[in-house]
């Protein structure tokens, strides 16, 4: 479904990503792991088109997205939930969700009922300002806003960061449901290993700008964790 091919990226003279290749299969949850500062967020931004790689390519369903800007990639079926949620605090929950409809152009003007089915709390709080929500509720809103755009591939950057355990469980259940019912492809940067092992199918482990290991999440062993994830 989604392929990153020999992708490198630099901020000026500072190399951040070096020859990254990944394949994210359709209808699976692929987790990107690594310590802080290894380039995970930068990789997602390159996939989404918010940054342009120095060299390399990004494909979705064999379509080359490399030269497309972020809005065209969104229209092609990519959705991003950025780190830190980035909801609009002075818009209501409903207005935040309607922002996600812009991806669909004139095809839709109403929030799908399924969104509120996935996140019932958002229906209850639809008239509340986004800034009044708790951190966990804001994360649910950020995910819901991305889903309004009907992505085929959902990119999430640390969706459990700063979130209480019960909301993490709810988010995990939603992601598993999206895979099971929609066949959605999910790519998730994540540091919470218990969450990765619970819902993830495959992983790529990054260190020093490169992919150093990959496989099934069940293959994540103590040696890999100690060498590449322990602080």
Label the model's feature ranges:
Residues 33-35:
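The feature captures the beta-strand-to-loop junction immediately N-terminal to the Walker
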Residues 56-63, 76, 108-111, 117, ...:
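Conserved ABC transporter NBD signature motif
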Residues 91, 133, 146-147:
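ABC ATPase signature
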Residues 148-152:
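A short, proline-enriched helix->beta-strand linker immediately N-terminal to the Walker B motif
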Residues 169-182:
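Helical segment within the ABC ATPase nucleotide-binding domain
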